Amino acid sequence: MKHTNQQGVAVIMVLLIVAIATTLATYIAQQQSLWQRQVESQFDRAQTRYLGTAGINWARAVLADDGASSQTDHAKEMWTLRLPAIPVENGEVIGAIEDRQGLFNLNNIVRNGASSAPDVAQFQRLLELLGLPPHLAPALADWIDEDTEPHPGGAEDGYYLALARPYRTANRPLTELGELVRVKDFDASIVARLQPFVSVLPKTTKINVNFAPPEVLAAVIKNMSLTDARTLVHKRTETPFTDVADFTNALKQFGALQPVVNDLTVNSQYFWVTGHARVGQAQVTTQALLYRLNNWPIIVWRSVQ
């Protein structure tokens, strides 16, 4: 009987050892598979980030080549074409370059630290064309300018410090469009309405008349109607303007308009680059603001998500 019991214990021990060994082997295999997937995932993520950076450098090279060969930027140039999905190993990459100087630069309304009345008036006209209250313009000017005296309809520190969650005015140029929600009477819906027509650029810029939408043209050219601006944009689609003089000549058909030619250009320096890369299950979206200086664009701002 004792011998039988010993045999039974031995069998149980063998079964236990086999079970442990089997479980351990399964665990090791699972861990190896998990480790392999993690390594592959990390590699894929690293590769997508690399492709995102490569996309920005591609855009810089394209814009540098364009700047070296032409002093006029318009929608018929090759760089405006969206990069189609290019296959890469186990994935793809897509990219696009957009002009940023056809939009109204919100930072233009303050120059050398002081509110610029002509630019504030232009922004007010744009607001009215978009069905938004014009007093948003002086409110933004007060947010950006360096003084503490509020404009009519605007607000300085006294207004913001009285809020439930007080803060002060920035007294500096905007750094991003989303900052507008901190300005008196702006909200997310107003920002969304403005987004297709405005930019936030670090320097004072001119409007590229070859890219400006009708609303922006009607805002920066006093007494120009939106209907006439749309007619001009239709003409531009067929034949881009070669220089500012070409543009002002085209304005003559609409009467005695007097644009401020120093505010206009046909050459852009700021561009927005968007890229999307996918490798395996990893995806990354890259955005960058480029400034073309002496033909070779520098990166002003970049985001990788």
Regions found by a protein language model. Give the residues of each.
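Compositionally biased linear targeting/interaction segments
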Residues: 2-305
